[in-house]
Every structure is written in C-alpha cells, then in structure tokens.
C-alpha cells in the first residue's frame, strides 16, 4: 500500500478479510470431553424434549396465573373508555373528563419478571381493547422531549387495520414531526376518523369496537421516572383528554404509596386510580414447583441441596421466577451432560425400550452406581453373581427397578400432599407452611426422625373433630384420584374414618337425649345432687378413660404416621435414583453463585481455564508469552511489592511481548514497534486500574499502588 502523494490527503485502506466466527452448536458439547459416550446425541435429544415440555408447561402456567389479573384490567379499560366518551358529550362533566383513567399495577420486587408480564399484557390489550398500546421505560425518558419522542415513535409503529391507501396517507416522517400533544392529538384524530364504516367485519380489529379506540400507555418502572416529567405529562394530557383518550398503566414494584410520593395532590387529583395486585412471587414459585417437580409428568428431579440452592437464590436475591426456571434448565442440561445414564431419564415405556439396547459400557455404568451397589449387597449370592456378570439379567432387573422407581414417585407425591394437608394449618408450622418446605425436608432425610415431625404428631392429637374431618376430606379427594391399588385401599380407609366420625355425632345425640330424659325423672333434692357430684369426682380421680372420639383421633394419627414411614422414604434410598435426580450442587453453585474475585483472578492468572486455547497452557508460575496483554501485566504485577515502578513494569511487559511476536525486523521500524507495545501496556494498566487492582499514588509520580490481596 503506497501512501506517497504530491499533496496532502487522506488514504483509505480496506481492512483485511476476517473469517466469520462459527458458533459451535450446543449438541457438539455433548460429543466432546470426558463425559462423551456413544449415546450423547440421544441424551441431547432427550434433554431438548423434556425442556420443551417444561417450557410449554411454564408458559401455560404463566397464562393461567395472569388470566384473572388481565381480565380485570381489560374490563377496567373498557369501562373507563366507554364512560369517557359517554361523558365527553356532556359538557357539564368537563371536570370529570380531565381525570385520566389510571391502573396502578403492583407487580412486586421481582423486576426481572416484569418485562414478560407486561409483554403478555400488551398482547392481550392489543387483541381485546385497542391497537394503540405503548410501553415506556424511565431510562429512555430523561426529559419531556424524549418522553414525547418515544411515545410518538411507538404510536407511529402501531398497526391499524385500515385500507392500504389510508395507511399511506397516515404515515408521517418522524423527522418532520414536532413532538407536542397538539400534534399528537391531531395525528390521532386523523387516524381514527379515516376508518371506513363500510369496511367488512372480517377486516376490522378491536379498534373498530369504538369509533375512537383509546391509547394505553404503560410505564414499566414508575419509581424510576423523573418526577417533573411525570407531572408535566399528566397535566398536559389531562387538557387534551377529550381529543386524545389516554389511559395510563403504572408498573409498580414496591407499593402504591409511591404514586403519592412522586405526584403532589394537584397532579394526582387528575388521575382516576384503580389498584390491581399481581400474584405473589412465593405463590408463583409454589405453583411452578407443584407442576414441574412434584409430579410424575416429568421424570427429571432435583436433589435436596440443588433445590435448596435454587430456592435460596429466589428468596434471598431476586424473587425472579424466570431466573429460577433458568436455573432449573441449567440443572437439566448439566444432568444430561454429566450423567451417561441420564439416557434413561424419560417416560417409563421409552426407558424400558432403551434398556434393551444398552451397550456393555452402559451396563458397567449401572453396576458402578452407589445405589445399585447397595441394592446388590442386599441380594442373595446367586442373584449378586447374575447381576454382576450377566448383562441380560441386569437389563431385566433394571427395567423392574425403574418401574418401582416410577411407582415410588407416584405414591411419594400423593402422601406428601396428604401430609401437607395435615401440617399446613398447624400452629407455628413445624414442617413449613408451603409444600416446597416440606418437600425439601423429606428429600434431606427420613422426616419421622426429626423433632419437628414429633411435634406435628402431638399437635394432631389435639385437633378438634371439625378440623380433622376437613383434613381427611381433602386427603380422600387426593387418594381417590389415584389409580394405584395400595393407595386405593388407603382411600377406602379414610372413607371409613369419615363414616366413623359421622356415626359419633349420631351416637352423641342419642346419648344426650337419653341423659336428658333420665335427668328429668331423677329427683333434684340436695341429697341426690351431692351424691351424684361425689360419684363424678371419684370417677375422674380413679381413671381417665378416653372417649370414642379420642380413640378414633389416635387411630387417624397412627394411620397418617404409617403412611409417612412407608411412602416418604428419601430418594437416595431407591436404586437407580441417580438416573433421574441431579445432585451436583457444587457445579450448579459455581454457575449461579458467582464469586467475582475468584473468577477474575482465575481468568487473569490462568486464561486457559476459560479460553481453552492450547497455546495459553503453561506451567504454574510461568507467563505464557501469547496471553492477552492484561494477563501479562497482571502476572507481572503479582511479582511486585506494594508500590510498582511503571518503568520497570513497562520494560518487563515489552520483554514478554517481544518474545511472543515473531515479526520481521524490516516490516516495522523499531520505534514504531516500541510505540505500539507502549500503547498496549498503557491500555493493560488502565484496565487493571478499572478492575481495582492498582491506583495512582502521590508518594511517587512514576509509581502506582497495588491494591490486591496477599500474594494472589
């Protein structure tokens, strides 16, 4: 490239062609590394199938949980808009007309879930109320100019089902638009008045329900908006409400009190506010766990420690359902990647079919499972030899064990729900108020060995008859829905208890009537009264016999205790539970509970750990000469004391970099090369300062102070 010219000029050089980076498909990771096996592709396909089923189930749950909230909002918007235009014809309602219909939507502190909820709300409003739905964020609206600009730009993009000619006439070039409420009102009137009344019904959208559909403005994070911007917009909009029918929806994360904190009375009086409350985050989490984990619909399960990590992140960090589901997806992916026998984590008929085609290596993997080894130790010597030597016999036994595991889960979740019916309303909630708390305790150990369970049994022995019958009724409905033989007998046993409680009422009434008749025949003189009192006192002091109700209540408690001890065994006691349960809590904690200090030191000290480039592999204590500049500067600064001489640091950096670059001495002059290396060094030092490893010092101008810890 020649840059010689007679006159001064600017020379443009096209950059060298760079190959486009090829993204590696995720399924390729299953075929590499130490966990690769002959069925890696099948494991990945199974993972995708289960995750798609879980994802569709969570989306369906989200729609069901938000349905009541969205229906109430749609009804409010329709009522507000119809009342608005009805009053607009009556000029005596001018004051009422200036009140903007406002929905205060309290979404909770789980801010990361707000986007998904408001996105779904936008779709519902566009399908049922109006096509003009706009969502604004505080970061995009620092002042009134940008607020109106974003509002106008999104309104221009809203699609109205009108004829193509009308579309062309309505379109306005945004560069020529003067952003004001007058121009916005004029644009709105021009759009709404050009709808063709003779348009076929099939071509009409929800906007044709009214002559002028409202404009719904959603403020996603109201707490973050500037107070002056909100006040000015509300005051201006109230003056143009008869021309521009606006409805506001405030997305609130904290409390409705924030409206009165941000807006003075003169401004808040211009709003007709109605409060709407979304579902609690904890209730949402309980529903997700109930539909995804506490069911036999999905074979994948979590161990106690893994579930505890996910719930702790949810409860003590962000209250985000979306992040919880992402953690569940990560657990599912890690299970299918790290466990070769996860190929059996599918529905029971498919798992039995796959067992027949297991290879010799997979059979050996089954024999290595700790739970299977414990199972083999309990068998007879002949069966032990067959399980350890015959693959055919092993496959038959594996099919039987997986079927038993499926039956175990079916009974486990039914009895778990039954126990929750008895414990969820007890004082102080010894086993937790939510079923997820009870589930974690049952996963951890044999729950009947805990002190909390003993206190539950004591409290159950103090329940009144009405409370006990209500709990039995709920359990009867649960067991009646089961098709299992043993649990079917359990339902009959509960039905017998209910019948016995019912018979107690009848016998008690008969006894009361007979006693009242006998008392009527007895003499009521002082002698007989004293005699009867002495007899009652002696009877109470000599023996305290249990009533029929107390005996029956004790039988019910013993029955529940026997169910718990029989069916709520911990999952790790079941053979082959490793195929379905993900228990690598340490791996999940590394991915989700990031330790920035450790991760940063590892990345700078050993870049091969993350980049996986063989050229970066080096012995401990050595500096790879092809490492990134910041890594070289970081490892050099580790060798220095509290104060680092920039000149010495720069020379050491240049020495390492020069050894790495095998450049032709004639291609670039020595001075230019030194300038390039010096610039790279300055950039590396600036990056280290930005990360907080060093800082300038006033003690010596050519030195920097080291801020890092110890010798790392």
From Swiss-Prot:
Positions of modified residues (Phosphoserine): 23, 516
Key words of the record: Chromosome, DNA replication, DNA-binding, Nucleus, Phosphoprotein, Ubl conjugation
Listed InterPro entries: ORC3, ORC3_ins, ORC3_N, ORC_WH_C
Cystine pairs: none
PTM info: Multi-mono-ubiquitinated by OBI1; ubiquitination is important for efficient DNA replication origin site activation. Ubiquitination levels are low in mitotic and early G1-phAse cells and are induced in late G1-/early S-phase, peaking in S-phase and decrease toward the end of the cell cycle.
Keyword Metal-binding included in the entry's annotation: no
GO molecular function annotations of the record: DNA replication origin binding
One GO CC annotation: nuclear pre-replicative complex
Compartments in which it is found: Nucleus; Chromosome
One GO term of the biological process aspect: regulation of DNA replication
Similarity field: Belongs to the ORC3 family.
Role played: Component of the origin recognition complex (ORC) that binds origins of replication. DNA-binding is ATP-dependent. The specific DNA sequences that define origins of replication have not been identified yet. ORC is required to assemble the pre-replication complex necessary to initiate DNA replication. Binds histone H3 and H4 trimethylation marks H3K9me3, H3K27me3 and H4K20me3.
Subunit structure: Component of ORC, a complex composed of at least 6 subunits: ORC1, ORC2, ORC3, ORC4, ORC5 and ORC6. ORC is regulated in a cell-cycle dependent manner. It is sequentially assembled at the exit from anaphase of mitosis and disassembled as cells enter S phase.
PANTHER family per the UniProt record, alphabetical: ORIGIN RECOGNITION COMPLEX SUBUNIT 3
Protein name per Swiss-Prot or TrEMBL: Origin recognition complex subunit 3
Organism name: Bos taurus (Bovine)
Name of the coding gene: ORC3
